[in-house]
C-alpha cells in the first residue's frame, strides 16, 4: 500500500504572518537560482579582462559549487543547533558583502577567493530556508503549498538568470551580475528578524567539529574528483581524491552511528519515503542538469541564438513548471505522494524522448514543446519529493534533512554535467571532421568541442570556416539522441525507485 505523508490536519487557518515570512524566505532561493546561471554569460568578459589561465578560469566557475556541496550537511546541522534563522541571516549578510567584493575583484585570483566565500555563505542559505518552512507551516496542506511556492521561486530564478544576465551584460560591466545579490538580500536582512520565527533542535547535543571536518573531507574530494575527471580524464590525482572522500565518508558514518547526538542522524535513511525521495531527486537531476547544459549550447552554437534569446526559449517551460508545482498541492489531497512523483517523473522522461523524436529537426519550437512537457513533470515531482523529504522526518531534524536534499541536488548537478558531458564529448569527437590545412593547435581545439570549433572558424577563410562549422554542428547534434536516451533512463530509474520504495 502506498505511504502517505501526513501532517497536522487542516483544521486551522495558517496565519497571514506565515505567508509573509514565506515571501521573505523565497528571496535567497530566487537569488541562488539566478546566481547559478548568470556567471556562464559573464565568463567571456571576465576572461577578456583578466586573461586567466584555463585552470584559473575553471576554478572561477567550479570553486563555488565545490565549497557549497562540501558544507551543506555541516551547515544544515549547524542551523539545527544555533538556530536556522540566525544561520540564514548570517549567510545572507555574508553573501551580499562578498558578492559586492566579487563584483569589483581586481584579479582572477581574488575572484576565485570571493567565489569560494560565496560557497560558504550559500551553504547557509538553502538548508535554512526549507527547514524554516517545515517549522513555520505545521498544517500539511499549507506546507505543501509553501514548498510549491519555494520550488517555483527556484524555477523562476533559473529561468530569469539568463535573461537578467544577458540584459545586464549588454549595458554594464561584468561585475553587475554579482551585484544582483545585494537588492535581493536586503529585504531578507531587514524583514527576516521581524517576520521569520526562530527554530532549532531543542536537544541538539554538543558541537562536533570532528564530524564537520569529516563531512567536508568527504564531499570536497569526491566533487573535485568528478569535476576533474570530466575536464581532464581519469588521473591518479582524481582517483586519490575520490578514495580520500570515500574513506572520510566511512569514518563520518561510523562516528555518527556511535554518537548519542550525531551531527547527521543516519537513522533518517531508514525512513524509506525520505531515502527514496532523495535518491529520486539525485537521479533525475543527473539527467536534467546534464542535458539542459547541452541544449543551451545547441540553442547558441548550433541555432545561433544570443544568450538572452536562448534564455527566453526556456521561459515557457519554467512557467509551466511553476503552475504544475502549485496545482499539485490540490492533487496531493487525492493521490498518494508516490503516485504523483512517478507521474511527474514519467512526464520528464517523455520530454527527453520528445527531444529524441525531433533530433533530425531540433528547431526552437521543438525544444520549447519538449521543455514544456519536461518542466511540467519537474514541477510535479520536485514539489512532492521536497515535501516528502521534510515531512518524513521530525521537525527538530529538518535542517539536516534539508541539507541532505540540497547535497543530493548539488551532487546530481555535478555528476550529470560530468558523466553526460563525457558521453556527449565522445560522440562529438568521433563524428567531427576537421578540414585539412589547419595547424595542430587549431585541429586540436576544433576536435575538442563545438565552442573550440567556433573560435577556430573565426580565423579561417569563409569556405573553410563554413565546412568546419557544418561538420561541428552535425557532430554536436549526433550526441543529442544518446544523451536524451540516457537522461530518460535515469529519470525512469528514479520513478522505479519511488514506486518500489514507497510500498516497502
UniProtKB/Swiss-Prot annotation:
What is its biological role?
A: Energy-dependent efflux pump that contributes to drug resistance. Catalyzes the efflux of norfloxacin and several related fluoroquinolones (FQ). Contributes significantly to the intrinsic MICs for ethidium bromide and acriflavine. Overexpression confers low-level resistance to hydrophilic FQ such as ciprofloxacin, ofloxacin and levofloxacin, and to ethidium bromide, acridine, acriflavine, rhodamine 123 and some quaternary ammonium compounds. May contribute to resistance to certain beta-lactams. Probably uses the proton motive force to export drugs.
Protein family (similarity comment): Belongs to the major facilitator superfamily.
GO terms under biological process: response to antibiotic
User: What happens biologically when this protein's gene is inactivated, per the record?
Assistant: Disruption or deletion of the gene decreases resistance to ethidium bromide and acriflavine and results in a small decrease in minimal inhibitory concentrations (MICs) for ciprofloxacin, doxorubicin, rhodamine, norfloxacin, isoniazid, tetracycline, ethambutol and rifampicin. Increased accumulation of intracellular ethidium bromide in the presence and absence of a proton motive force.
Q: Which Pfam families match?
A: MFS_1
Q: What is its main location?
A: membrane
Q: What is this protein called?
A: Multidrug efflux pump LfrA
- Top-rank taxon of the source lineage equals Bacteria
| Cellular localization per UniProt | Cell inner membrane
| Regulation acting on activity, per entry | Inhibited by the protonophore carbonyl cyanide m-chorophenylhydrazone (CCCP). Ethidium bromide efflux is inhibited by chlorpromazine, thioridazine and verapamil.
* One GO location term (cellular component): plasma membrane
Q: Which residues cross the membrane?
A: 19-39, 58-78, 87-107, 110-130, 145-165, 172-192, 206-226, 233-253, 275-295, 309-329, 338-358, 361-381, 408-428, 480-500
What is the protein's membrane topology class? Multi-pass membrane protein
Q: Which InterPro entries match?
A: MFS, MFS_dom, MFS_trans_sf
Q: What induces it?
A: Expression is repressed by LfrR. Induced by ethidium bromide, acriflavine or rhodamine 123, via inhibition of LfrR binding.
Keyword field = Antibiotic resistance, Cell inner membrane, Cell membrane, Membrane, Transmembrane, Transmembrane helix, Transport
GO terms (molecular function) for this protein are: transmembrane transporter activity
The organism is Mycolicibacterium smegmatis (strain ATCC 700084 / mc(2)155) (Mycobacterium smegmatis)
**Disulfide bridge partners, by residue number:** none
Amino acid at each position: 500500500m502506498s505511504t502517505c505523508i501526513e501532517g497536522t490536519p487542516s483544521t486551522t487557518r495558517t496565519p497571514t504572518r506565515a505567508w509573509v515570512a514565506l515571501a521573505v524566505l523565497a528571496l535567497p532561493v530566487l537569488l541562488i537560482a539566478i546566481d547559478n546561471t548568470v556567471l556562464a554569460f559573464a565568463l567571456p568578459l571576465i576572461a577578456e579582462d583578466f586573461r586567466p589561465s584555463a585552470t584559473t578560469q575553471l576554478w572561477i566557475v567550479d570553486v563555488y559549487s565545490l565549497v557549497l556541496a562540501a558544507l551543506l550537511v555541516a551547515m544544515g546541522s549547524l542551523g539545527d543547533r544555533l538556530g536556522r534563522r540566525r544561520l540564514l541571516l548570517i549567510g545572507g549578510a555574508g553573501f551580499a558583502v562578498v558578492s559586492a567584493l566579487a563584483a569589483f575583484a581586481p584579479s582572477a585570483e581574488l575572484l576565485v577567493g570571493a567565489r569560494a566565500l560565496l560557497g560558504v555563505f550559500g551553504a547557509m542559505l538553502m538548508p535554512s530556508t526549507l527547514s524554516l518552512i517545515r517549522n513555520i507551516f505545521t498544517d500539511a496542506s499549507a506546507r505543501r503549498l509553501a514548498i510549491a511556492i519555494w520550488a517555483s521561486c527556484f524555477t523562476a530564478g533559473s529561468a530569469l538568470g539568463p535573461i537578467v544576465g544577458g540584459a545586464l551584460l549588454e549595458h554594464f560591466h561584468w561585475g553587475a551580475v554579482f551585484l544582483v545579490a545585494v537588492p535581493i538580500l536586503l529585504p531578507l536582512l531587514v524583514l527576516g528578524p521581524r517576520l521569520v520565527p526562530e527554530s532549532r533542535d531543542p536537544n541538539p547535543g554538543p558541537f562536533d567539529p570532528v564530524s564537520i571536518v569529516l563531512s567536508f573531507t568527504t564531499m570536497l574530494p569526491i566533487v573535485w574528483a568528478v569535476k576533474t575527471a570530466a575536464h581532464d580524464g581519469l588521473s591518479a590525482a582524481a582517483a586519490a581524491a575520490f578514495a580520500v572522500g570515500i574513506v572520510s565518508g566511512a569514518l563520518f558514518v561510523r562516528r555518527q552511528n556511535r554518537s548519542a547526538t550525531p551531527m547527521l542522524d543516519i537513522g533518517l535513511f531508514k525512513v524509506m519515503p525520505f531515502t527514496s525521495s532523495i535518491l529520486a531527486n539525485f537521479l533525475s537531476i543527473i539527467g536534467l542538469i546534464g542535458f539542459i547544459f547541452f541544449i543551451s549550447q545547441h540553442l547558441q552554437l548550433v541555432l545561433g541564438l544570443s544568450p538572452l534569446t536562448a534564455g527566453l526559449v526556456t521561459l515557457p517551460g519554467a512557467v509551466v513548471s511553476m503552475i504544475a508545482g502549485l496545482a499539485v498541492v490540490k492533487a496531493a489531497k487525492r493521490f498518494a505522494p508516490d503516485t504523483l512523483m512517478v507521474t511527474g517523473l514519467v512526464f520528464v522522461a517523455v520530454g527527453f524522448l520528445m527531444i529524441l523524436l525531433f533530433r533530425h529537426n531540433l528547431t526552437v519550437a521543438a525544444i520549447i514543446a519538449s521543455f514544456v512537457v519536461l518542466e511540467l513533470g519537474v514541477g510535479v515531482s520536485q514539489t512532492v519529493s521536497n515535501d516528502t523529504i521534510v515531512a518524513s522526518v521530525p521537525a527538530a531534524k529538518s535542517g539536516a534533512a534539508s541539507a541532505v536534499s540540497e547535497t543530493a541536488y548539488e551532487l546530481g548537478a555535478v555528476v550529470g554535467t560530468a558523466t553526460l558531458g563525457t558521453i556527449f564529448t565522445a560522440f562529438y569527437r568521433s563524428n567531427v571532421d576537421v578540414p585539412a590545412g589547419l595547424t595542430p593547435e587549431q585541429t586540436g581545439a576544433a576536435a575538442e568541442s563545438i565552442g573550440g570549433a567556433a573560435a577556430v572558424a573565426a580565423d579561417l577563410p569563409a569556405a573553410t570556416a563554413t565546412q568546419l562549422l557544418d561538420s561541428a554542428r552535425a557532430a554536436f547534434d549526433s550526441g543529442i539522441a544518446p544523451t536524451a536516451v540516457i537522461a530518460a533512463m535515469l529519470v525512469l530509474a528514479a520513478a522505479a525507485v519511488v514506486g518500489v520504495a514507497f510500498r516497502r
